[in-house]
Each structure stands twice: as structure tokens, then as C-alpha cells.
Regions:
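Conserved active-site and cofactor/substrate-binding residues in soluble primary-metabolism enzymes
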Residues: 1, 48, 54, 100-104, ...
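Hydrophobic alpha-helical segments within soluble ligand-binding/sensing domains
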Residues: 1-4, 30-32, 78-81, 96-114
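Ligand-binding cleft/hinge of the Venus flytrap
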Residues: 3-16
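Hydrophobic alpha-helical
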Residues: 6, 20, 24-83
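Hinge/cleft segment of the Venus flytrap/periplasmic-binding protein
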Residues: 9, 97-143
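A generic structural signal for alpha->beta connector loops
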Residues: 15-18, 44, 69, 89-90, ...
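Short beta-strand elements at the ligand-binding edges of bilobed clamshell
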Residues: 21, 87-99
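Structural detector of well-ordered beta-strand residues that form the stable sheet scaffold
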Residues: 49, 71-73, 91-94, 129
Length: 143
């Protein structure tokens, strides 16, 4: 869903395109190797988006090793990711809300077993954590 979401947003910006999609198998080492490979194949690449909790950190490792700069975007709020956002190595991370996810799941299950209609898909909010240090609401919670 994360890649699908990115594609749906990028479609609104004709000046932007996704150069390539790689998999890291949720491995920081693989994310670093894939980022180095991407930057070799696409030297003008401006940004890298990591979709697993470790991908952003792996991409950061790669740009540091290559002594280059790129815009890096991540998911989730591992302590090291939050520090990388604070220090400017990662521009932004999208943070899930696990308590909301769990309570929504329980409420939907309750409704389902009560015979009520439940949606096929239910989205929960996310927070955007950037270098300002404040988590901004996004998704359905955005103003």
C-alpha cells in the first residue's frame, strides 16, 4: 500500500517520476546496497523513499558512504530514524499510529461479529515527523 500511495501522489506531478523500485527484504544492509545501486544507475536521482522501517536508515548509510546528498524519506519512528530526521540526514518519516490501528481493528471486529456492515478498507491516521521536531497530523487527521 505504501508504494501504491506514493504512485497515486506522484501521478499528480508530471515533473516527477519514479525512476525505479527495489526491494530490501526489510534489511538495512540490503536497503543500503540497493540505494548505492540506484545512485550508480541514476546519478541524477534527487530523492530516495524507503518503505520499511529500516530502508530510510539503509539509504542514509549509502549516501554517507558515497559522500553525497539526496533527499531521503522514511517510514516509522525507530529511535535512530528520529535522530536522523532531527539531524537532517532524513528529511521526513511517516509514522503509523499502532494504538489507533489496534483499537480500530477491535472496533471493526466487534461490529462484524455483531452483524453490522464493516468497510472493506479502513485507513488510520499517520504523523509526519520532520526536522522541526513536531509530528504533524496527516491522512484523515490532517486539517
Amino acid at each position: 500500500l505504501r508504494l501504491e500511495g506514493l504512485r497515486s501522489i506522484i501521478a499528480n506531478y508530471p515533473e516527477m517520476k519514479i525512476a525505479d523500485v527495489r526491494t530490501s527484504d526489510i534489511s538495512r544492509l540490503q536497503a543500503s546496497e540497493q540505494t548505492r545501486s540506484l545512485l550508480a544507475a541514476y546519478p541524477d536521482l534527487k530523492a530516495v523513499v524507503g518503505f520499511s522501517a529500516l530502508d530510510g536508515l539503509g539509504a542514509l548509510d549509502a549516501v554517507r558512504q558515497l559522500k553525497t546528498q539526496r533527499l531521503l524519506f522514511a517510514f516509522d519512528d525507530l529511535d535512530e530514524t528520529k535522530e536522523a530526521v532531527r539531524s537532517g540526514g532524513i528529511q521526513l518519516t511517516l509514522v503509523q499510529q499502532p494504538l489507533e490501528m489496534g483499537s480500530t481493528a477491535i472496533a471493526l471486529l466487534h461490529d462484524y461479529f455483531q452483524g453490522k456492515s464493516v468497510p472493506d478498507v479502513s485507513y488510520t491516521s499517520i504523523r509526519l515527523l520532520d526536522g522541526s521536531g513536531s509530528a504533524q497530523p496527516a491522512g484523515e487527521d490532517a486539517p
